[in-house]
From Swiss-Prot:
Record's protein name: Ribitol-5-phosphate xylosyltransferase 1
Organism phylogeny: Eukaryota, Metazoa, Chordata, Craniata, Vertebrata
Localization: Golgi apparatus membrane
UniProt effect for mutating G333R: In MDDGA10; uncertain significance; loss of binding activity of alpha-dystroglycan (DAG1) for the ligand laminin in fibroblasts from patients; loss of alpha-dystroglycan functional glycosylation in fibroblasts from patients; does not affect Golgi apparatus localization
Family, per entry: Belongs to the RXYLT1 family.
Subunit and interaction comment: Forms a complex composed of FKTN/fukutin, FKRP and RXYLT1/TMEM5.
Classification via InterPro entries: RXYLT1-like
Stretches assigned to the Extracellular side: 31-443
């Protein structure tokens, strides 16, 4: 019995030793044989052989084992990387070379800010006494203020660079604009302002002599002048042309293009809603429309007296006419340039523009080959230009033959051009300010 127990114990001890030897063999020799299987992923091209770098082999093999938290670790790494990029982005966004405040004291200021700069205003209520907004373009940070409460001497001036937007169309407006310029002049003299530019709604006859003494080239302090209409002063050095834009004073909105605006069949060939002046080209236009019966194919609504403000109903009718017409007829008024041109562009309705120079001192065709509408023409406006309304019947006959798909492409082209036009103006305006104001700072 004792012998049997002794043999059993010896057998168990021998079995234990064999198992230990097997385990040791597996630990020291088995893992080495596994190395080639892991090498395609664990060892990169040009890595040292396993025999020479056992320590590296060990860590490489361990790194190739499946890690259940690998996905979470990668996500965390990506999150950290994203966060660092956001921090960097925020830090660079705040870095601007120039701060400019725009004082909007004419309705054209809203076209500049909301339509060209695509800026927002707080509050959004158009009747608010004080409205403001901010935007960054290029290296310039803009702030914009407007409203009846923006009065000379009644708000704090804590900027060095100002763009003043004024209305100089008639005597009463000129008097008001002059008060603002005298206020700005005083700020420059006491060194509260360093640089000043003016955006001016000029006179429709281009009679703007009143502002001449304020220009820097004439000994004044206004470094840059952006002026509406084809002024003969425009030289693209210190006087630049600026567009009239839409009638923001009549609450014409910022229009977002829609699928239906582009693709729907429009029921009217053309539209004209406006005031008819006696012995004017507008009267000639109406006669031509009626003569050929095209007034029945177009949305036409004429009135005898100009109205400075629209009712909600009349504004909606006008917008519907633009939206539902392929062409918008744009006869000259006191000046060739009119709000209707830009409003038609907003709705993808091709402007048919009476391309004739009106009376007054605006740029003449013998000196300025692009006049009238130099700015629009220089930027490739895809309009239909005619010299006489007698050409209109032929235009409308051609329009009747154009299929919907061609009209869709034409609308796309017009809307894309108009967006590009506004973007280019924003960048050009900013580049001019930066070049002038920053250069003068260095000198």
């Amino acid at each position: 019995m004792r012998l049997t127990r002794k043999r059993l114990c010896s057998f168990l001890i021998a079995l234990y030793c064999l198992f230990s030897l097997y385990a040791a063999y597996h630990v020291f020799f088995g893992r080495r044989r596994q190395a080639p299987a892991g090498s395609p992923r664990g060892l990169r091209k040009g890595a040292a052989p396993a025999r020479e770098r056992r320590g590296r082999e060990q860590s490489t093999l361990e790194s190739e084992e499946w890690n259940p938290w690998e996905g979470d670790e990668k996500n965390e790494q990506q999150h950290r990387f994203k966060t660092s990029l956001q921090i960097l982005d925020k830090s660079t966004k705040g870095k601007t070379d120039l701060s400019v405040q725009i004082w909007g004291k004419a309705a054209i200021g809203l076209y500049l800010w909301e339509h060209i700069f695509e800026g927002l205003l707080d509050p959004s209520d158009v009747t608010a006494q004080w409205r403001e907004g901010k935007s960054i373009v290029g290296r310039t940070q803009y702030s914009f203020i407007t409203g009846p409460a923006v009065i000379p001497g009644y708000f704090s001036v804590d900027v060095n660079n100002v763009v003043l937007i004024l209305n100089g169309r008639e005597k009463a407006k000129i008097f008001y604009a002059t008060q603002w310029l005298l206020y700005a002049q005083n700020l420059v003299q006491i060194q509260k302002l360093q640089h000043l530019a003016v955006v001016l709604l000029g006179n429709e006859h281009c009679d703007n002599e009143w502002i001449n003494p304020f220009l820097k080239r004439n000994g004044g302090f206004v470094e840059l002048l952006f002026i509406i209409y084809d002024s003969p002063w425009i030289n693209d050095v210190d006087v630049f042309q600026w567009p009239l834009g839409v009638a923001t004073y009549r609450n014409f909105p910022v229009v977002e293009a829609s699928w239906s605006m582009l693709h729907d069949e429009r029921p009217y060939l053309c539209n004209f809603l406006g005031t008819i002046y006696e012995n004017s080209s507008r009267q000639a236009l109406m006669n031509i429309l009626k003569k050929d019966g095209n007034d029945k194919l177009c949305w036409v609504s004429a009135r005898e007296h100009w109205q400075p403000q629209e009712t909600n109903e009349s504004l909606k009718n006008y917008q519907d006419a633009l939206l539902q017409s392929d062409l918008t007829l744009c006869p000259v008024g006191v000046n060739t340039e009119c709000y209707r041109i830009y409003e038609a562009c907003s709705y993808g309705s091709i402007p048919v523009v009476e391309d004739v120079m009106t009376a007054g001192n605006c740029g003449n065709t013998s000196v300025h080959h692009g006049a009238p509408l130099q700015l629009l023409k220089s930027m490739g406006a895809p309009f239909i230009f005619i010299k006489n309304w007698k050409e209109l019947p032929a235009v409308l006959e051609k329009e009747k033959t154009i299929i919907l798909q061609e009209k869709i492409e034409r609308r796309k082209m017009l809307l894309q051009w108009y967006q590009h036009f506004k973007t280019e103006l924003k960048m050009k305006f900013t580049n001019i300010l930066e070049s002038s104001f920053l250069m003068n700072n260095k000198s």
